């Protein structure tokens, strides 16, 4: 990560990050530690000691078990929660019941722990997959259904208990260390370019690509914000094509052997980050060309 462009005016922590061992979680935990915050990572399985972010505490627990989360938050005097723990699209498709337990019950558990302990800062990941689309005007997969439910649950939780949460809808977050998930192909293509290897992105089309540095800054700013009602927002309205991604890679590595399969993925429709802009104002965007450069250089280091 480059130098952090944002430093909160007041301490945010201790910050509890559920799912903090994943790609986005690691980047956020690293940034929080660099800011001097106290950070507790809650995951079903903590990473090996050598893979942990120095300065952060790691605790194992099951997001489906509210008592696990409550114990950790109470023991560490948590002041903010970033809820990232979730099963992604393939896992939800393979085991819908488990997907609902982790993604929906887990979300309810995190909200209830925040309520019980008087924690007022609560930021969580939703997804563009929550947006209705297609002939049925519904999310296209169960992961999106679960995320849409979490958005509505958060709004009702505010009506019942007054917790003004912030839900963020990323689309494709890329950067070094992103090697898992359907859209990790963007990062994997950049890794291949850095290593001089061939790689075919298994789809084409247009999407919202955001470098992890930009997304981390948005999360930090949201943690420092004080909304008076629940906020749900897309992160960006910028849409680029896979051809744009390939061009950005070749601008850094002209010899790169990267391509895309002719399997089209539809571009997201109706995206709107006005709620986020109204809450935060501006932040430091990372254009695709710059994000590709950072990612390729990091993979090549």
Enumerate the predicted regions with their spans:
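Active-site segment of SDR-like NAD(P)-dependent oxidoreductases
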Residues: 87-89, 128-132, 171-174
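Conserved Rossmann-fold NAD(P)-dependent oxidoreductase catalytic core, especially the SDR/UDP-sugar
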Residues: 101, 105-144
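C-terminal substrate-binding subdomain of Rossmann-fold SDR/epimerase-dehydratase oxidoreductases
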Residues: 197, 202-301
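Rossmann-fold cofactor-recognition segment
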Residues: 54-65
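NAD(P)H-binding glycine-rich loop region in Rossmannoid oxidoreductase-like domains
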Residues: 63-102
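N-terminal Rossmann NAD(P)H-binding glycine-rich loop of SDR-like oxidoreductase domains
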Residues: 14-35
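NAD(P)-dependent short-chain dehydrogenase/reductase
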Residues: 142, 155-207, 212-214
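Conserved glycine-rich Rossmann-like NAD(P)H-binding loop of the short-chain dehydrogenase/reductase
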Residues: 37-48
């Amino acid at each position: 990560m480059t130098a952090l462009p944002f430093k909160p005016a007041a301490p945010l922590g201790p910050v509890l990050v559920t799912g903090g061992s994943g790609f986005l979680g690691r980047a956020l935990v690293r940034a929080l530690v660099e800011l001097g915050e106290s950070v507790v990572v809650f995951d079903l399985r903590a990473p090996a000691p050598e893979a942990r972010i120095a300065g952060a505490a790691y605790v194992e627990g099951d997001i489906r078990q509210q008592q696990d989360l409550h114990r950790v938050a109470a023991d560490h005097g948590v002041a903010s929660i970033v809820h990232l723990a979730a099963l992604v699209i393939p896992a939800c498709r393979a085991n819908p019941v488990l997907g609902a337990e982790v993604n929906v019950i887990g979300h309810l558990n995190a909200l209830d722990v925040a309520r019980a302990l008087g924690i007022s800062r609560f930021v969580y990941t939703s997804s563009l997959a929550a947006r209705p689309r297609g002939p049925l005007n519904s999310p296209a997969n169960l992961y999106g259904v679960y995320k849409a439910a979490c958005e509505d649950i958060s709004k009702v939780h505010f009506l019942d208990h007054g917790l003004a949460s912030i839900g963020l809808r990323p689309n494709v977050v890329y950067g070094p260390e992103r090697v898992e998930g359907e859209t990790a192909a963007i990062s994997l293509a950049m890794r291949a370019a850095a290593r001089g290897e061939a790689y075919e992105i298994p789809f084409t089309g247009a999407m919202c690509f955001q470098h992890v540095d930009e997304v981390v800054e948005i999360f930090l700013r949201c943690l420092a914000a004080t909304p008076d009602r629940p906020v749900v927002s897309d992160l960006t309205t910028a849409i680029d094509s896979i051809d744009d991604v390939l061009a950005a890679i070749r601008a850094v590595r002209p010899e790169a052997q990267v391509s895309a399969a002719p399997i089209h993925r539809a571009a997201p429709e109706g995206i709107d980050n006005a709620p986020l802009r109204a809450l935060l104002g501006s932040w430091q965007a990372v254009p695709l060309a710059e994000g590709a450069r950072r990612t390729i250089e990091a993979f090549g280091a």
